[in-house]
Amino acid sequence: MASLGLSFPPAAKTPTYLASSSSTFFSNSSLSVRTSQFRSRNSVFACVKCDMPESLNVGNGNPSIPIINERTLPKFLESARMEKSVNRTNTRLKLFSGTANPALAQEIAWYMGLDLGKVNIKRFADGEIYVQLQESVRGCDVYLVQPTCTPTNENLMELLIMVDACRRASAKKVTAVIPYFGYARADRKTQGRESIAAKLVANLITEAGADRVLACDLHSGQSMGYFDIPVDHVYCQPVILDYLASKSIPSEDLVVVSPDVGGVARARAFAKKLSDAPLAIVDKRRSGHNVAEVMNLIGDVRGKVAIMVDDMIDTAGTIVKGAALLHQEGAREVYACCTHAVFSPPAIERLSGGLLQEVIVTNTLPVAEKNYFPQLTILSVANLLGETIWRVHDDSSVSSIFL
């Protein structure tokens, strides 16, 4: 039976990171970083310093990808864990990656001072998935990094099989690290005879044998209640806030905008940490799935720098129509800040249309090179996830990271 395998080496190379300066909240320093080379999807970013603008050989423009390293940690993290890590060859903490986002997993491993665990993942000719752990996990605290992004069902099934493999190999604890949780939007019924797929997926992960879930910026907080196991909800706002602070935008010019009524709580929390900026709300009504209609604006944005905050960008209809309304109401500039870059067609065409000054996302799921465009900025959440994993492993407080 034919198969396609993915095997991680016993000691993956440490990635090279780049950032121009250390940033702190609302400092006068500026962060401007360009990458000059990218490896394939199954490797980490390779970055070199560019003192002058240098074109990338990509179709849609030059993405700006600041990646945090030990010199440029945001203020909420004190230092990298390299010097604090346990013996690499004799540890009860194991970190494995699925095939969905191995670049992020490698960055997390670098921050933690660990090597990624060796695992062989295959796709058989009929589409079945095969997983074999190539090192012992007996009695270990195992963390599996696997966002359930596109192809959603395939990546979800791979995660379930990885969890099962760890459980059958006598791992002491298995934590599913899910930077992007697919099906999170199916968290309630909006019409009769619909399923609540988020609850179903939570049940599948639990029944597969996971002891804990670590997820980033869930679509709704109540999704945590669908699990019968502990869930650590990681908020990626500090990474985005730290980057915005490096742009030195005067606080009196800022206004935080929620693209819909449902995101008001998220935008309010963001505004409070962004110099307690004023809040505006875009009132929209949906006529169907992935279709948004902007109706009205609540709040004043005239002459302001508008920061639109949401958990994800899918087809970008909400963000782009909201940006058009903000410009119509007199906003000077519009930024979009979202954790998850889903980027389903026709998102790239919409986002690169000129309405947005900058589109700021994170690397919770991989962004294909074909989807790069000049306004795109990708921030790494590897340090945030790495620190969270360490604290869970050490039985320390996780919530204190975000206070």
Curated annotation (Swiss-Prot):
SMART domains: Pribosyltran_N (SM01400). Transmembrane segments: none annotated. Keywords: ATP-binding, Chloroplast, Kinase, Magnesium, Metal-binding, Nucleotide biosynthesis, Nucleotide-binding, Plastid, Transferase, Transit peptide. It holds the Pfam family Pribosyltran_N. The keyword Chloroplast applies. Residues 1-49 form a transit peptide. Binds 1 Mg(2+) ion per subunit. Its cofactor is Mg(2+). Its main location: plastid. The keyword ATP-binding applies. Signal peptide: none annotated. Mg(2+) binds at D217, H219, D228, D232. One of its GO terms (biological process) is nucleotide biosynthetic process. GO terms for molecular function: ATP binding; kinase activity; magnesium ion binding; ribose phosphate diphosphokinase activity. Residues 303-318 are annotated as: Binding of phosphoribosylpyrophosphate. InterPro entries: PRib_PP_synth_CS, Pribosyltran_N, PRibTrfase_dom, PRTase-like, Rib-P_diPkinase, Rib-P_diPkinase_bac. It catalyses: D-ribose 5-phosphate + ATP = 5-phospho-alpha-D-ribose 1-diphosphate + AMP + H(+). Its EC number is 2.7.6.1. This is Ribose-phosphate pyrophosphokinase 1, chloroplastic. The lineage of its organism: Eukaryota, Viridiplantae, Streptophyta, Embryophyta, Tracheophyta.
